[in-house]
Amino acid sequence: LYYKVVDSDDWLDTDALKKVLERLTTLVARGTAPDLMICNYVYEHVEDGTSHTVRYTNVFPQNRLFDWVHVRHFRPDQNLLMHSVMYRTEVLRQCGMVLPKHTFYVDNIFVYQPLPYVKSMYYMDLDLYRYFIGRADQSVNESVMIGRVDQQLRVTKHMIDCQDLDALKGQKRLRTYMVHYLSVMMAVSDIFLLLDGSAEAHAKKAELWQYLKDHVTPGVY
């Protein structure tokens, strides 16, 4: 009924998972299964043994069904990531999502493309996902991202193409969030192309912005 992605480096807190599954079981039995279940996630820093929790208590109502009308402002560090979401499987089928094969960073597509199909959400203030970070060869390591920037660009272009954001004008908060998420993807691509610094990277940066201009309306651009 629900689909949760867990990276091979990461893990789920067993006590939190039990509570989430119990709540979903109750909601399904009542016929009020949410399209999207949201929980907190925790950065587990391997270098110094510290941790940092990303929670959404200021963004979402807790322990009840809600929709985008009830969603408040996201801080820059509060994007919905793969770590924080659990989609109802039928929603993933409905959106027709096909992830690029043999490509890193597709978790951004996974969390982004289904959002217009989400009609109901549920947030539990539980630290469910533990995100292990700090390994030298991780895909989010700076030098690794510079080397894989073409895959970041491929994912960003896929996200530009996969939704017509102007079709969401009647859902202001959803549209605002999705434009914001796409802006973050553009910014990340820009940063790593600038860090590369080569003439080829600068050309790729210009090409990406031209691609965006050619594939969205001036209002989105």
Placement of each model-derived feature along the sequence:
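Short aromatic/hydrophobic "clamp" motif used to bind/position activated sugar donors
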Residues: 3
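Amphipathic alpha-helical repeat scaffolds of TPR domains
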Residues: 177-191
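C-terminal, non-catalytic tails of nucleotide-sugar-dependent glycosyltransferases
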Residues: 151-176, 217-219
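Donor-binding/catalytic cores of nucleotide-activated saccharide
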Residues: 10-122, 129-145
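Short, charged, amphipathic alpha-helical segments
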Residues: 172-180, 202, 206
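Catalytic metal- and UDP-sugar-binding loop of GT-A-like glycosyltransferases, i.e.
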Residues: 6-8
